[in-house]
Amino acid sequence: MEDTAKYLIHADFVVDGVVERSDVVGAAFGQTEGLLGDDLAIPDLQDSAKLGRIDVSVDSEGGQSFGDITIASSLDRVETATLAAALEAVERIGPCRADVEVDRIEDVRAAKRREVVDRAKELLATAFDEGAINADDILDEVRESVRVDDITDYDGYPAGPNVDSSDAVVIVEGRADVVTLLKYGIKNAVAVEGTNIPDAIAALSREKTATAFLDGDRGGDMILRELGQVGSLDFVARAPMGECVEDLSRRTVDSALRNKTPASAAAPIATTQSETAATDGSATPAPTPEPAPDTAPSPDSDGDDTEAAAPPTLAEHARAVADTETARLLDDALARIREVPAAEVVDAVADADSVPAVVVVDATITQRLLDVAAQRGVASLIGADTDEFVKQPLATRVRTLDDART
């Protein structure tokens, strides 16, 4: 009966005297008989399996007996409540005066539902071999495996598949760094595998536009110093202080490469950090030196400073690109990152080390170019004209060369 019961009636009783369990059961049968009619007679309900056995627990102390009654019911709510109220009509148990009061009527199904929920929580926390994987996680895992499979070597050193064909190269410390950059779509990275720079990579840095992307620690400083001596660096990007390139998120990688500095202006991170270290062995930092006045730039940097102070305007870029069948990738300051044939602009945007802020192209802006630009985070696309777009992302602004030149 307990397996099919819908409700459990719980009642408490107090008896002015010492009674046994059988006295309580007999009182429940005898004093409710005929009270509710034949349809709710306890013996008949038990015979038809609509009511379970009457379970009684009883204790005696100080000349009084007290305990509780539990009855399982598969009747409906109204009939169960009526039967429970009938139990309170019991006034005597055995030869003694008694008081019976229904404490509660428990919905067994609700209790089972609570058990199911609690068990489901437990299983969710402990029974699965792996955490829940959503669709984005699955796609990222597949992309990562494909990109890791794409890892090649350059003269025996780990490299992305585009190192030979690209006109720019990103030099990193180890294989794990190459894998991380591949995962984020950067396919022209090559690893030096230590602080001793291989001759092949030193030569590569002289042949291509070279960016060193190094860890934010003393090891990165050592590699940077040696690259500056045996190779030819154009730019330097660093992981945040104390962090490794292989552990960086996509956002941090993009930010570091976008904010790369000219190699001539790059300062070692460890040196910068140690400037505030104590000079006497104490824990108190040494005073920060006053910055040198910048009223007298060195003669060697005059040309660079002038160029940096006055980059071409967007209109000038648009006029320069018009009728040339070329494309320019520009950063936030409208400085040129790269110039490629217009036919290669989609691949150039997709594979750019540093995500361009603006792309100016002497060609029609197609849906494919717009999709790739929006995916990479390009803010503005400027072209000779535009296709009819099926969808146009709000984050990427589309204009024509004529608009930009005015």
UniProtKB/Swiss-Prot annotation:
It is an enzyme of class 2 (transferase). InterPro entries: DnaG_primase (IPR050219), Primase_DnaG_arc (IPR020607), TOPRIM_DnaG/twinkle (IPR034154), TOPRIM_dom (IPR006171). The keyword Membrane does not apply. One of its GO terms (cellular component) is exosome (RNase complex). Residues 167-253 form the Toprim domain. One of its GO terms (biological process) is DNA replication, synthesis of primer. Its cofactor is Mg(2+). One of its GO terms (molecular function) is metal ion binding. PANTHER family: DNA PRIMASE (PTHR30313:SF2). This is DNA primase DnaG. It comes from Halobacterium salinarum (strain ATCC 700922 / JCM 11081 / NRC-1) (Halobacterium halobium).
